[in-house]
Amino acid sequence: TLQESIDAIKSETESMKDLVEQLLFLARGDNETMQLHKQDFDACDVVEEIVGEMEMIDPSHNFETDLNRDAYISADKQLFKQAVRILVDNSIKYTPQGEQIMVKVAKEENSVSIIVQDNGIGIAPEELANIFERFYRSDESRARKTGGSGLGLSIARWIVERHGGYFEVLSRLDIGTRIIIIMPTK
C-alpha cells in the first residue's frame, strides 16, 4: 500500500540520517576536532538515566541495575552517556523479548566499571576481536535483520579510549554477552 511505502521511506531516511551522524562523529574524532568537556560525576547517575529511558521506550525487556554509588569519574558526560547507551541498545537488539538486561556500576580503587550483561544471542569467539571495527557486523547479526551500521561499538571505543578507559568483553553463543567499560577514577 501507499502508507507502507511511505513508512518504509521514513524508516530508511531515519537510518540514513543516523549513519551520516555516526560517520561525522568518527570523522571529527579522526581529525581530532572534537573537544571533550570533562566534568566530575557519579557514573551511577548516567546509568540510572539511561535505564529509566530504556524502560519507557522498551517495556519488552526486563532491565535490572546494580549501582555502587559514588562511582565518580571525570569525563564528557554526554559522550560517556552515548557510549553506555550504545551498549544497552546492542543488548536490546540481540536479547529476546522478556529476557533480562543487567547494567551494573562497580568501583575499584583506581577505576569504575560499567557492566552491561544480557542473555542474548552471544558473539562467536572468532568474531570477538572484530566487534569494535568500523562497519563490522557478525554473521549472526547480519542474519537477524536487526539493522545498524556496524559503527556503534567503534564510536563507543573511541569515546572510552579518548577518556583513558578500555573495554573487556566476555561472550558465549546462545548464552549472552557481558561488555565492561573500565574508566579511570577522577
Where do the PLM segments sit?
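Short conserved segment of the HATPase_c
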Residues: 123-137
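Short alpha-helical segment of the dimerization/phosphotransfer core of two-component systems
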Residues: 11-16
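A conserved beta-strand-to-alpha-helix junction within the catalytic ATP-binding
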Residues: 37-52
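A residue-level detector for a conserved hydrophobic packing site
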Residues: 80-84, 112
